[in-house]
Amino acid sequence: MRQSWGEQEMQFADPELSRVMNEKFGKLTLAKTRSIVNLPHVDFTPLNNLITGNNKVKSFEEIKHFTGLKRIFYLCDNCPNLGGTMTIPESVMEVGGRCFFNTQLIGIEFLAQNFKWGHGVIWRCTKLKWVKMHSIEVPQKNMPNNQYLFDFAIANNTWKLYVPDGSVEKYRADHNFANLGERIRPMSEFKE
């Protein structure tokens, strides 16, 4: 019997992530995945840090299917073995501080326009090679101040920020990204 659109079960490549998701949500279909607005904390409070501190999760590329998410805070905070890449859906309009703290991610892509971010988003991401931001206007901090640039305490000054071709100079002029200088590159130059 064929399943109707969206009723296919969501498959997670990482066994630990699959276990956590099954424990919190039961059977996750594609339709249910797309309707989730918050990913609950380990104690089921809606704090969006479902896998915080989990040292067994190694990938979460499936985040791209959670197209109903509005905000993510501490989502992968201190997941020291989380690697690969993540594409954050365009529905996510706020990315909280420490969201990817102390991970082994090599790439993060933000699809949203005009999203907000918290300081320390990529703190201690020593393996990071690239970040792609599709926002034409420069994303701003959720708590405006002149402290804590986007790459605050990353301990890696080789990663590149890819932005829309027509927005490169806007990003280079913005206080929170100006320190990246020539590492801010046009999206058309991106090659994995």
Name these PLM-found stretches.
Residues 5-10, 29-42, 49, 53-71, ...:
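Structural signature of tandem-repeat unit edges
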Residues 11-15, 19, 23, 182-185:
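Solvent-exposed adhesion/ligand-recognition segments of exported proteins
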Residues 144-153, 169-182:
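Short, aromatic/basic amphipathic alpha-helical patches
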Residues 1, 190-192:
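Short, solvent-exposed mixed-charge patches
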